[in-house]
Structures are given as structure tokens and as C-alpha cells.
């Protein structure tokens, strides 16, 4: 049981990092994402019609989704704002999000999380053909659930924290970046010069810098981040152009 629990923890962490990297949106979009609404897997099924794998996966977020998950609002002349009219569709390449592990996570790991959160009877398993629970189900039960977390969604900041820990590990242990704090916790302290560096928002800077600043593919950078070139150039890209 302990090994299974640990496997679920590690696979969840991998999925958080891989999906944030593949998607390019803000943390709130993925934190609020629900299966069947925003996460749309094309399933491979056996002769009985039961899901046995994922062929491909499409995500679909809209400007008129509920506030906790919708795309960033655009500002109108005069200071008003309205949701973007268009729908943003994207896909997760298997080179970033391993589809075999994704299937195990979506069906099996999320089933265990749903059981612990009280969202699914213990004798049932998530059926991906009809699944509408959160993409990232909090493994901790909550006594009171708002509409925003009715599907078991993680609390604010948790996804960014998981991504930040992975980014810190990569910078320190894989890339050997000198001068880093001794731990991720030290990097997050209020007086640390690295505070705010390790978090999910960094992937948007990386995307804008690589696709826009270095390769001058602002069209792709805009699609990846669902943001506009002036904003990406001013606040995200680290390459002056």
C-alpha cells in the first residue's frame, strides 16, 4: 500500500510538471480544469468498449468559462473588460506528456484521489468516457466545497509549488547552477533573491523567450500562452527585440 501511494504521489508530480509545460496557460486554468469540459481525451477502447489507452488529447478553454477557470479577459476601450470570444484549443504532445502514464494517472491515480476525497464510491473506478471530475483531484477530503472545487480541484498555489520544486531540483541537481539556496524552502523565503523565480508562471516566460524572443515565432508564442505579443514582449520574453 505504501509503494502504491508513493507511486501515485510521484506520478501526480510528474503529470503536474509535464502538463504545465505542455499547456502554457496560467495555473488557475489547469487548477480549475475538469475532464469532459476542458480536458478531452480521445480514447482507445477494447472490444467491450472499455478504455485501454489514450490516442490523443485535446484541451479546450474558453473566455466565457466560469471565472475560476476561464481564459484571461481582454480589456476594452474605456476600461471595461469582456471574456475573449474565441475558444483556445491545444494538444499535449506525447514527447512531453507520456500518454501511457497519462492514462494510468487519469484513470487509476485519480480514482484513488477521488475515493479519499469522498467524490467516488470505493467500489467504483473512474470511467474516462463519462468523467467530469477535476483533472487534478486533491487527495485530501474537504468538508465544504464551493462550485469552483466541486470536482475536487487542488487548492490555489499547489500546482505552482509542485512545478517550482521540480524546477529548483533541475536547476540545482541537473544543470548544476551555482549560487542557489540550499533548499526550495530557502528559495521561497521573503528575503531570498530567488523568491518568485521557481513557479508555474516561469513556463510562460520560457515559452515567450524561446518561441518569440529567440525564434521570432510570436504567432506560436501567442497560441501557447494565450496572450498577445506586446504583453509577452513586455513582461515575459527575456530577449530584447
Regions found by a protein language model. Name each.
Residues 50-152, 157:
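Basic, alpha-helical nucleic-acid-contacting "clamp/cap" segments
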Residues 11-13, 25-26, 88, 110, ...:
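Short, cationic motifs built from Arg/Lys/His that form the positively charged side of catalytic pockets
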Residues 1-28:
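Basic, Lys/Arg- and aromatic-enriched nucleic-acid-binding interface segment
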Amino acid at each position: 500500500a505504501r509503494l502504491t501511494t508513493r507511486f501515485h504521489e510521484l506520478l501526480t508530480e510528474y503529470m503536474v510538471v509535464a502538463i504545465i509545460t505542455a499547456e502554457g496557460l496560467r495555473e488557475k486554468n489547469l487548477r480549475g480544469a475538469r475532464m469532459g469540459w476542458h480536458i478531452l481525451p480521445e480514447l482507445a477502447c477494447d472490444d467491450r468498449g472499455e478504455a485501454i489507452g489514450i490516442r490523443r488529447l485535446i484541451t479546450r478553454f474558453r473566455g466565457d468559462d466560469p471565472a475560476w477557470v476561464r481564459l484571461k479577459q481582454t480589456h476594452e476601450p474605456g476600461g471595461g473588460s469582456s471574456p475573449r470570444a474565441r475558444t483556445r484549443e491545444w494538444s499535449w504532445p506525447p514527447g512531453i506528456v507520456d500518454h501511457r502514464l497519462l492514462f494510468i494517472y487519469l484513470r487509476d491515480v485519480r480514482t484513488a484521489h477521488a475515493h479519499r476525497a469522498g467524490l467516488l464510491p470505493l467500489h467504483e473506478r473512474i470511467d474516462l468516457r463519462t468523467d467530469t471530475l477535476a483533472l487534478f483531484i486533491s487527495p485530501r477530503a474537504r468538508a465544504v466545497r464551493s462550485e469552483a472545487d466541486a470536482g475536487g480541484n487542488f487548492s490555489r498555489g499547489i500546482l505552482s509549488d509542485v512545478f517550482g520544486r521540480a524546477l529548483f531540483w533541475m536547476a540545482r541537481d541537473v544543470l548544476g547552477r551555482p549560487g542557489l539556496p540550499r533548499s526550495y524552502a530557502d528559495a521561497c523565503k521573503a528575503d531570498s533573491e530567488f523568491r518568485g523565480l521557481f513557479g508555474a508562471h516561469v513556463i510562460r516566460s520560457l515559452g515567450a523567450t524561446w518561441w518569440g524572443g529567440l525564434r521570432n515565432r510570436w504567432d506560436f508564442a501567442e497560441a501557447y500562452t494565450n496572450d498577445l505579443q506586446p504583453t509577452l514582449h513586455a513582461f515575459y520574453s527575456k530577449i530584447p527585440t
